[in-house]
Amino acid sequence: MTNEPLLNRNHKDALFRFIFNNPKDLLSLYNALNGTDYTDVSDLTVTTLEDIVYMSYKNDISFILGSEMSLFEHQSTFNPNMPLRGLFYFSSLYKKYVAENNIDIYSSKRAQIPIPRYIIFYNGRQEMPERCTLRLSDAFVKKSDNYNSNQVTASDTSSNCNSVKFQPAMEITAHMININIGNNAELMEKCRLLHDYAAFIGLIRDYVSQENDINTAVTLAINQAISHNILKEVLSVHTAEVRDMILTEYNEEQHIKNEKNISYDDGFNDGVECGIEQTKIEAIENMIKL
């Protein structure tokens, strides 16, 4: 690979978001996930927060459909902190929803709000199961003797204020779906665009492993995809934008990897220096004892 820095700090859409930002395609993805058959895009209200940025690009899509408020995020690296991020995101979404719908949260009447749903589409290189669930409660620092990890319902009398055991005040559940080629075949079959996205990412990785120059690898991957009718409509019309997105995401991944390597090297060097210093101290102490 070339060592030329290609990091672009302007906020951009991630390729996944760019593809599924179209309400029609987003509706298709939702239908594939849920086994539904919505066709009217006017049923879908996009609620994506425009000021939420991951690294230097935007990888999120949120929307309301029926009684559900869904948050879709794409991740190319596994992040166990997604439920915590989801907590902050949904907090902002609900605050916005309450304001836009003139809901009085101080009223004696119970407010009606959409059901939250959090889906993470993962296509990183780290081996992961086809589907898994991440929970905010997994991150809680300490489970005291009074902590009850069992799920309870609102009607469960053991969850009242006089109970010795207590439930955490909140929980956020994120469902992670592996969209690398070879995973979740049924879902991929139902949503052609998701399948093509996964196939295109696979092509990019293949060419990156073969070529010395990332720009050449991306160009070859785009040409190969178009010739095989993979994301052809998107790639033919938005070639420059797609190339820019891929380079941005690729270099963010490289940036993260480099930072980890730097941290490791710094830690190793600090450890060596501390070891040398400790050896000097022990030598002096031994001389004094003599």
Regions found by a protein language model. Give the residues of each.
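Elongated, amphipathic alpha-helical interaction scaffolds
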Residues: 1-290
